Amino acid sequence: METIQAIMTRRSFRAFKDAPVTEEQIKTLLEAAMNAPSAGDGRPWHFVVTTDRAQLDALAVEVDEGNEMFKQAQAAVLICLDRLLEGFGGFGEQDCSCAAQNLQLAAHDMGLGTVWIAIINVPPRTAGCRKVLGVPDEQIPFALFPLGVPDEELEAETRFDESRVHIDRW
């Protein structure tokens, strides 16, 4: 898949088939995420991956209660922010966002679906990730991605809005 096509057609999937996600696919996703740009080349991230059914079911309760996507997902990836690894202080959220976008685009390219679940600054979700995935206190759970083969088809739609573009000055 070409990069522009991947960007324009990526969608957030919340329903997944009962189909495996392989270790090789997960490794490729992590490699893509870790190749994201970061301020000062700090790469201030750690990743927690689970394919354990009990943990995925627990995430459905502890992180996103009432949402069935974790019960259908075959895997989940949590990106954690490590402030001690920031190349330049204060840019860790941007760095982790770049890694998250790479992960989502790589998943799309491989025919997998995911959705970005915001964790940072949402205390109940942060606590849920710490509880289920054993995240240490010095790490900051940033974003969580249920992962699987999509069980729905979502049409690509243009999101370009020329009224939000300002040339030379506002």
Report the location of each language-model feature.
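Acidic, surface-exposed loops and disordered segments
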Residues: M1-W170
